[in-house]
A protein has these predicted regions:
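Active-site neighborhood of HAD-like aspartate-dependent phosphohydrolases
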Residues: 1-53
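A short acidic, often aromatic-flanked loop/helix-cap motif at beta-alpha or helix-coil junctions
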Residues: 122-128, 154-156, 170-176
């Protein structure tokens, strides 16, 4: 059996934070950019907005068409797929947002069908050889090779202490996978 590669959607394969912030900025006159988000607590960056104002923008079905790929994610995921790696997108997306978000993900990643999308808020329960994620909490205690996808909000996390390999971009991810799990 070929290696199973699990990959996250938000801020790993698609630029979720940029899309989300653009909509919040448009609706509420804020000027925040994704590079400024250095923590998982998004609310601290919007002291004048309610949680409802920040999160309800994701309930608009039209927002998902603004979701774009992270640079080189399409290229390298397609290469891995063509080389025979088994690819599964693993997302903690709320169920109500899944139909529209998954439709957009399938438009962006042609190899991704319904059988290769897993919804799980506890990614440690999903089996695979590799997990690529920007959330350290999704990698800690997982029984897979851990690739922490570098983002501003996880840069202070001590990935070396948790046996995680930090990838600065998709070329790093590709190299790490080939170094650890080459397909012959």
């Amino acid at each position: 059996m070929n290696p199973v590669i699990l990959f996250d959607s938000d801020d790993v394969s698609v630029d979720f934070m940029k899309m989300w912030l653009q909509e919040i900025n448009r609706l509420h006159g804020c000027g925040l950019k994704s590079e400024q988000i250095k923590s998982w607590n998004l609310m601290q960056y919007f002291p004048d907005l309610t949680k409802e104002q920040v999160f309800s923008v994701l309930d608009d079905i039209n927002i998902w068409q603004n979701l774009n790929p992270i640079p080189e994610s399409q290229k390298y995921l397609s290469l891995l797929h063509k080389e025979g790696y088994e690819l599964y997108l693993v997302t903690a997306t709320p169920y109500s947002q899944c139909p529209h978000k998954c439709k957009r993900l399938q438009q962006l990643f042609a190899f991704l069908d319904d059988e290769h999308i897993i919804i799980s808020h506890n990614k440690q329960m999903v089996r695979g050889d590799v997990l690529i994620d920007d959330g350290p909490h999704n990698l800690v205690y997982g029984e897979y090779f851990k690739i922490l996808f570098d983002r501003p909000h996880n840069r202070k996390f001590p990935n070396d202490e948790y046996d995680m390999h930090r990838a600065k971009g998709w070329s790093d991810v590709y190299r790490l996978i080939h170094d650890i799990f080459p397909i012959k």
